[in-house]
Swiss-Prot record:
This is Probable dual-specificity RNA methyltransferase RlmN. Disulfide bonds join 104-332. Belongs to the radical SAM superfamily. RlmN family. It catalyses: adenosine(2503) in 23S rRNA + 2 reduced [2Fe-2S]-[ferredoxin] + 2 S-adenosyl-L-methionine = 2-methyladenosine(2503) in 23S rRNA + 5'-deoxyadenosine + L-methionine + 2 oxidized [2Fe-2S]-[ferredoxin] + S-adenosyl-L-homocysteine; adenosine(37) in tRNA + 2 reduced [2Fe-2S]-[ferredoxin] + 2 S-adenosyl-L-methionine = 2-methyladenosine(37) in tRNA + 5'-deoxyadenosine + L-methionine + 2 oxidized [2Fe-2S]-[ferredoxin] + S-adenosyl-L-homocysteine. The active site is at residues 91, 332. Residues 97-327 form the Radical SAM core domain. Keywords: 4Fe-4S, Cytoplasm, Disulfide bond, Iron, Iron-sulfur, Metal-binding, Methyltransferase, rRNA processing, S-adenosyl-L-methionine, Transferase, tRNA processing. Reaction proceeds by a ping-pong mechanism involving intermediate methylation of a conserved cysteine residue. Its cofactor is [4Fe-4S] cluster.
Length: 350
């Protein structure tokens, strides 16, 4: 079965021609899928019943099923848990800002990177998400809320560079003027630092924002937090980041989760300053989300601001990430893990 929502426009034209259909039919279907956000072929009312039946028999129409929604009473953040067609689950977050709505999506079911501060790695990677499954997280949220999504962050469960080909196809579809037409500059992709794939991404010269999950200013400390550091050194990561900036002209963002007593010292701040000085970059400080299965604790507010001030005084562009959805299991993987626990406790019932 063809995953029809993962086809770009030209591929869909070819596919429809194989069914004996003219090009304009492909345009109609593409509009239903990516602009009108139809839930199924049945909603494509300007396609004949015979064509809709033919499509049902030859292709799969991905439409994620929301099984749990949490609403933050603190800031209006909404967290969605979606069931996939194979029974797996992924989660997404809608964050509301004055400049528009931003959706954080997952790129994989689970994750194999093993970062110690992240809940999505607790049970490892199950599988990659297809372009359609990444897109439909955004489509479902926009359709459920009736509010336009203006920004997309690929920073949920999974490592996007570990699902590279599907990620690039997803960006192409999301950016297509025939669909949601979300500007590349409004798309942020996070990575823990798979260097060869980051180089490939740089060579594409896309105008997306790249966010590197750094979290430590030296290899020794980073290895205790992120297993990927055993494969790629910070020096290699910084080199590919400079290459990315050179190729794209885009500023790099470095994510730095502050963990109490681990990476929040003034010495760490000094090392971080030396690491990024002179780069066209931005540091995003993140008070780590406490996870019951991990022993990491959040740095105190006073220490967070001391760390920030140290960077600012040395000319580093830095912000503290606003904590969103703190009362609704807002960190990556927490809602999925809790839901799976609930299913286990109820012996498989929903």
């Amino acid at each position: 079965m063809t995953d029809i929502k993962s086809l770009n426009y030209d591929e869909l034209v070819t596919y429809m021609a194989g069914l004996g259909e003219k090009k304009f039919r492909a345009g109609q279907l593409y509009q239903w899928m990516h602009e009108k956000l139809a839930d199924s072929f049945d909603e494509c009312t300007n396609l004949s019943n015979a064509l809709r039946q033919k499509l049902k028999e030859t292709s799969e129409y991905v439409c994620l099923e929301p099984v749990r929604v949490q609403h933050s009473k603190l800031d209006g953040t909404e967290k969605y848990l979606f069931r996939l067609s194979d029974g797996n689950y992924v989660e997404s977050v809608l964050m509301k800002y004055h400049h528009g709505n931003s959706v954080c999506i997952s790129s994989q079911v689970g994750c194999r990177m093993g970062c110690r501060f992240c809940a999505s790695t607790l049970n490892g990677k199950v599988r990659d998400l297809r372009p359609s499954e990444m897109l439909d997280q955004i489509y479902r949220i926009q359709k459920i809320t009736g509010e336009r999504v203006s920004n997309v962050v690929v920073m949920g469960s999974g490592e996007p560079m570990d699902n590279y080909d599907n990620l690039i196809k997803f960006i192409e579809l999301l950016n297509d003027e025939r669909g949601l037409n979300i500007s590349q500059r409004n798309i942020t992709v996070s990575s823990c630092g798979i260097v060869p794939k980051l180089k490939e991404l740089a060579d594409l010269k896309l105008q997306i924002t790249l966010a590197i999950s750094l979290h430590a200013p030296n290899d020794e400390l980073r290895k205790t937090m992120m297993p990927i550091a055993n494969k790629y050194s910070i020096e290699e990561i910084m080199d590919v980041c400079r290459y990315y900036i050179e190729c794209t002209g885009r500023r790099i963002s470095f994510e730095y989760s502050l963990v109490k007593g681990v990476n929040d010292s003034m010495e760490c701040a000094k090392q971080l300053i030396e690491l990024v000085k002179g780069m066209n970059c931005h540091i995003n400080l993140i008070p780590v989300n406490p996870i019951k299965e991990r022993d990491y604790k959040q740095t105190g507010k006073e220490e967070v601001y001391a760390f920030k001030n140290k960077l600012e005084k040395n000319g580093i562009n830095v912000t503290i990430r606003r904590e969103m959805g703190r009362d609704i299991d807002g960190a990556c993987g927490q809602l999925r893990n809790k839901y799976m626990e609930d299913i286990d406790e109820s012996d498989g019932g929903y």
